[in-house]
Amino acid sequence: MSGFQMPQANFKAGFVRENFNKIAKKYDRFNDWNSFLLHRVWKNHLVREIENNFSGHLHVLDLCCGTGDISLRLENSSFVDHVTCVDFSENMLEIAKTRLKKQAQKGRVHFELGDATKLIQFQNSQFDVVSIGFGLRNVDNLSKAIGEIFRVLKPGGMFLNLDVGKVKNPWIRWIADFYFFKIVPILGYILWGGKNEMFDYLPVSSLSYPDQETLQLILEKEGFQRVQYKNFVFGNVVLHVAKKPSEKT
């Protein structure tokens, strides 16, 4: 395992924001390298899951949107009318704005600098769908973030969360951990041109993040129903899908 020590909870948000700002320009290439381009497949699957559950005209909140990789896929979907992109890294959000400039000019995309645990700029029941890609484990208060997601979703709306998972098979887990904790940081150093603690943080942050079943229980505790998940690459990555209950008639 890496010798990197996670920042204390009250310093985590500042650490994450500062360091994502630093690596923003290299982040997409880093994802390509460390996932062998598979992150693109997983993100496409997230969008297809939305399309399989709705008829169209969707207003989507892409939370922790980063450089807009999922936002772009959502905007390209004929099922989506509007995407609101939120991140608390200014530099990440600037890249998303550049990437989606034409779509924003058409009024199909909107950008907000914001914190996933304090979505005060949004009304209750405002969005049909909320998506997060590899961002939930970076928040400093998981329960608060999920509570906010639940609040801004319309009744019957859907939350989709793509992030790291836990591999159950011990032999595969050993290989996965070796790659994630030893090789992935080195790939980051090569890309960065030197050592950078953010590339150590990314794998270490997975240690305190809930496994598939635990996150499912947390989502249900916060009020979500029909919570399911799909594993990719033996559970190294997982997509959770959860529904907010419809209003009683």
Swiss-Prot record:
GO terms for biological process: menaquinone biosynthetic process; methylation. InterPro entries: SAM-dependent_MTases_sf, UbiE/COQ5_MeTrFase, UbiE/COQ5_MeTrFase_CS. GO terms for molecular function: demethylmenaquinone methyltransferase activity; methyltransferase activity. It comes from the Bacteria. Transmembrane segments: none annotated. It catalyses: a 2-demethylmenaquinol + S-adenosyl-L-methionine = a menaquinol + S-adenosyl-L-homocysteine + H(+). Keywords: Menaquinone biosynthesis, Methyltransferase, S-adenosyl-L-methionine, Transferase. S-adenosyl-L-methionine binds at T67, D87, D115, A116. Its EC number is 2.1.1.163. Pathway: Quinol/quinone metabolism; menaquinone biosynthesis; menaquinol from 1,4-dihydroxy-2-naphthoate: step 2/2. Methyltransferase required for the conversion of demethylmenaquinol (DMKH2) to menaquinol (MKH2). Belongs to the class I-like SAM-binding methyltransferase superfamily. MenG/UbiE family. This is Demethylmenaquinone methyltransferase. It comes from Leptospira interrogans serogroup Icterohaemorrhagiae serovar Lai (strain 56601). The lineage of its organism: Bacteria, Pseudomonadati, Spirochaetota, Spirochaetia, Leptospirales. The gene is menG.
